[in-house]
Amino acid sequence: MLNILFCGKGGQGIIYASKIFTECIFYNSNFEICSSETHGIVRRGGPVQTQIRINQSTIYSPVFETADYIVDFDGEESIRYLNLTSPSTKIISISDASLQHKLINAKLPRYTSNLFLLGHFVHTIAMDNYPWLDYIKPAENQRAFQLGCTL
């Protein structure tokens, strides 16, 4: 079982990124996948998180106590979820200087950073062989995702 937490703030595209992630895996693999969303204060800037579980057999609940991966679209939100970590939890954050440097040099619009980080994450977990671009529109978002997959 793989437990993944996407976290960030309202307006950063966390729900959009998780929808792309779950739909692509659901329609293109033999894995079971289940997710849940939690919106904080319903406004831009409020905390948002999505818990995603992937398994080869039935999943009975999308909620978990320990994350294998935390994907932090904000750079600071992962601190809020330290209670879901273990010594083996890997945190992938947009605050990583090498990721920021690559994103800035690509001169992509700021709103594509969620798909850039999603691309980096799917590459990290070796799932970049799925037809991700079929689920991502428009072209700027595809470019950001592909750039993330190269890191």
Sequence positions of predicted segments:
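Active-site cofactor/cluster-binding pocket
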Residues: M1-L151
